[in-house]
A protein has these predicted regions:
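Short, charged/polar, low-complexity loop and linker segments
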Residues: 30-32
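Stable alpha-helical elements in mature extracytoplasmic
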Residues: 24, 43-50, 133-136
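Compact alpha-helical subdomains of small soluble proteins
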Residues: 76-147
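Cleaved targeting-peptide boundary
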Residues: 17-26
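Sec-dependent N-terminal signal peptides
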Residues: 4-14
Length: 147
């Protein structure tokens, strides 16, 4: 009986440990595969994710490349502004309400990138390579270059 209880306990611990190591977010590509890109909510989320990933990239390179770090922050803020505009148009929100919600959303997403970037660093000594973060940055770069 003790062995069965021990096996059950170990099973739950190993399952929980795998959940802890899993990424916080799914990639933007996976997200968009399940959503309608024409939907305003999807577009707002995409703009927020891209703003967050550019903010994250800016923070990572700040000490080694301040010029590009500043460019990334400018891009992130531009994407954030577009998200605010879309919320006002799509959801008929007031400017201040839209701004607060978008900033809170970006902060949460930014923290998720930080957490997943740290996990990726522990795994392969890169904040980007070998993770969905690199893929997200590539997708967002295409979005920024289209505009």
């Amino acid at each position: 009986m003790k062995k069965i209880n021990l096996l059950i306990f170990l099973f739950f611990i190993s399952t929980y440990a795998n959940d802890i190591k899993a990424d916080t977010e799914t990639s933007i590509k996976e997200y968009l595969n399940k959503k309608n890109i024409e939907d305003g909510a999807t577009q707002i989320y995409l703009l927020n994710r891209c703003s967050a990933v550019y903010t994250y990239a800016s923070a990572i390179i700040l000490k080694i490349d301040t010029e590009n770090s500043k460019k990334f922050i400018d891009i992130a803020n531009n994407l954030l502004f577009k998200s605010i505009e879309l919320r006002i148009i799509d959801r008929k929100e007031k400017l201040e309400d839209a701004r607060k919600k978008v900033e809170a959303d970006r902060e949460k997403l930014f923290q998720n990138y930080i957490n997943d970037g740290k996990k990726n660093w522990d795994k392969n000594k890169s904040y980007f390579k070998g993770s969905y973060i690199s893929e997200d940055l590539s997708i967002c770069e295409k979005l920024v270059n289209e505009k």
